[in-house]
Amino acid sequence: MLLTSSSPCESALATRYFRLDACLSSRYEVLDGRFTGEPVLPLCYGAGKVEHAESWAFREGIDLSRSYFYTDSNTDLPMLLRVGRPRVVNPDLRLRWEARRRGWTVLDWSRPDGALGLDDDASPQD
């Protein structure tokens, strides 16, 4: 499942490309077949991302406390706090600090050999 602040146009392409089961994204008003640019609230961003995820999880019978969430941005901190298995990938400095403080798994997917690496100071929580 893709949970993104991107528009439905962009996120639908990624959802199909990666063969994901579902996608939740920010939505924008359409009037007479054209985008007005006005967002439909809540945006799928920050705390709004949690609202979208909770509604979807309730409808689908998904337990977020047993779910994973992967991100590189500190703007996703509310969602990381909501799931049971937060994963931080190539984080910005603020998120790296927060992940270390909370003992979250930090993944390095930027290695040239394509290997996955774990941050030395973080350990898996499963």
Can you describe what each PLM-predicted range is?
Residues 1-126:
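C-terminal cap/substrate-recognition subdomain and adjoining C-terminal extension
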